[in-house]
């Protein structure tokens, strides 16, 4: 908080009922302009090291010298490579901690593009299927181990959930052999 020159923490909720200790979003925005501020800047995400040589540390990066609208177009362009368009009704499931760079970027990009984001407190294979079914999840970002654990679930467990809403699953962090990418693909 010292870096942003404030001694207050803003806690707010978006939704039907405010949580204890928070203020409803409409109360915070009442009387505020509806147009972007004239001096706005792009900002930058704080990424974290893996912590292999100690505790994870935040890595402060420079602010990109791009207009915020240009940065938004870059976010949109990145996800369009995967067939994900701005404001097209996608629901992104985040099942890993946001301190992982790729997870934070996919989640942040989804929010920038106007998509709904569903956060999991703790990832489990069946928990993921349940959320896909309940929220109509269309995209997610996972590591190959998560794919393996999903495929290791018994068929009767997998069959309980409707996952027809899924349009794009992206993996990173480790190689994923081609024969594991598609369960019906023949082994090489």
Where are these regions (language model features)?
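Conserved G/P- and acidic residue-centered "switch" motifs that form tight phosphate/ATP-binding loops
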Residues: 52, 114, 173
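Short beta-strand->loop structural element characteristic of the AMP-binding/adenylate-forming
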Residues: 1, 10, 58-60, 116-122
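ANL superfamily adenylate-forming
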Residues: 2-46, 55, 64-77, 153-154
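Conserved S/T- and glycine-rich ATP-binding loop of Class I adenylate-forming
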Residues: 49-52, 92, 98, 132, ...
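Adenylate-forming
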Residues: 1, 16-19, 96, 126, ...
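A short helix->loop->beta-strand "cap" motif at the edges of active sites that frequently abuts
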Residues: 5-11, 115, 164-167, 188
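Thr-Gly-centered strand-to-loop micro-motif
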Residues: 61, 94-95, 119-120, 170-172
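Conserved AMP-binding/adenylation subdomain of ANL enzymes
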Residues: 67-91, 99-138, 153
């Amino acid at each position: 908080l010292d870096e942003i020159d404030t001694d207050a923490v803003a806690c707010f909720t978006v939704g039907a009922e405010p949580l204890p200790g928070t203020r409803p979003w409409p109360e915070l925005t009442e009387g505020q302009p509806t147009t972007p501020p004239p001096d706005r800047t792009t900002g930058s995400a704080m990424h974290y090291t893996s912590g292999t040589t100690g505790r994870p540390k935040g890595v402060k990066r420079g602010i990109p010298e791009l207009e915020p609208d240009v940065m938004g177009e870059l976010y949109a362009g990145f996800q369009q490579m995967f067939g994900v368009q701005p404001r097209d009704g996608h629901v992104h499931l985040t099942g890993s901690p946001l301190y992982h760079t790729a997870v934070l970027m996919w989640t942040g990009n989804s929010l920038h593009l106007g998509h709904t984001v569903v956060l999991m407190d703790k990832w489990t294979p069946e928990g993921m299927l349940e959320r896909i079914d309940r929220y109509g999840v269309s995209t997610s970002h996972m590591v190959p181990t998560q794919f393996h654990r999903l495929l290791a679930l018994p068929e009767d467990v997998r069959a309980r959930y409707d996952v027809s809403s899924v349009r794009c699953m992206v993996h990173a962090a480790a190689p994923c052999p081609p024969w594991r990418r598609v369960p019906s693909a023949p082994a090489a």
